[in-house]
A protein has these predicted regions:
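Bacterial Sec-dependent N-terminal signal peptides
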Residues: 1-24
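Aromatic- and glycine-rich peptidoglycan recognition patches
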Residues: 21-39, 45-49, 98, 113-114, ...
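Extracytoplasmic/secreted envelope proteins and their assembly/folding machinery
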Residues: 57-61, 65, 85-89, 119, ...
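Structural motif
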Residues: 122-124, 144
Length: 181
């Protein structure tokens, strides 16, 4: 009878130990998933089709992730509603600590125009949609993707290779050195 009790106790201790290890692993996995930085990284890795490298500007990606789905509002610059230049202005203020204008045409005057092939994370992209002047802008994220406030879907990520954006793309721009920092 003593051996049965000892075996039963050993089995119970083993079961409790295994259960505790399983719970600890599940808790660590849940913490990893709920970490906003991990969520942003996972989101952009999927959207952009590439793993974000350690050299990526994670502050940029986190900002965009936090604003995805913000509704469009002409002249807006808050999470209650934002237009394309208001979004870029907020992003540059919060991510790069740089103040830029709040109108896409005025902002274009603050950049050095660059070719599409030269675009880097954080550069600006400009569009002429149904006009001879700039009517829309966004922030380049890498891998031909850009973040912008769409009048129909709010803040979102789009691809410069999509037919619509390819048709209306005007130029890329990098903020003038005198305006940075």
């Amino acid at each position: 009878m003593g051996k049965k009790v000892i075996v039963a106790m050993l089995l119970m201790i083993s079961f409790v130990s295994i259960q505790a290890q399983t719970n600890n692993k599940e808790q660590k996995q849940a913490e990893k998933i709920e970490d906003p930085d991990n969520l942003a990284t996972e989101y952009f890795s999927q959207i952009m089709g590439v793993a974000l490298s350690a050299t990526s500007n994670l502050k940029l990606y986190q900002f965009v992730y936090d604003w995805i789905g913000t509704p469009y509002r002409l002249g807006g610059g808050t999470k209650r509603g934002v237009d394309c230049s208001g979004f870029a202005t907020e992003l540059y203020n919060k991510v790069f600590s740089t103040l830029i204008g709040n109108n896409s045409r005025n902002i274009f005057s603050m950049v050095n125009p660059i070719n599409k092939e030269e675009l880097k994370e954080g550069d600006l992209v400009f569009f002429k949609i149904g006009s001879r002047s700039i009517t829309h802008m966004g922030v380049y994220m890498g891998n031909n993707k850009f973040a912008h406030a769409s009048s129909s879907k709010g803040v979102m990520i789009s691809d410069l290779d999509e037919a619509y954006w390819r048709r209306y793309y005007y130029k890329g721009g990098r903020l003038l050195a005198s305006l940075r920092d």
